[in-house]
Structures are given as structure tokens and as C-alpha cells.
Amino acid sequence: NYDKPPVEKPPVYKPPVEKPPVYKP
């Protein structure tokens, strides 16, 4: 028996961003 259906794509890891990345050269 299958516990869960086969995943089409792997889960995308997105870290929670508090603020947008600041570009500082």
C-alpha cells in the first residue's frame, strides 16, 4: 500500500526571507 502518492518534483527549499537582499558592492 502507498502511504503517499509519488512526488512529481522534489520540494523546493525556500528559506523565509525577512527582507529582500541588499546589494552592497
UniProtKB/Swiss-Prot annotation:
A GO cellular component entry from the record: extracellular region
UniProt lineage: Eukaryota, Viridiplantae, Streptophyta, Embryophyta, Tracheophyta
Localization in the cell: Secreted, Cell wall
Recorded superkingdom: Eukaryota
Region 4 X 5 AA tandem repeats of P-P-V-[EY]-K, annotated ranges: 5-24
Region (Disordered): 1-25
Bias kind Pro residues: ranges: 8-25
Keywords per UniProt: Cell wall, Hydroxylation, Repeat, Secreted
Keyword set includes Methyltransferase: no
Species per Swiss-Prot/TrEMBL record: Phaseolus vulgaris
Protein name: Repetitive proline-rich cell wall protein
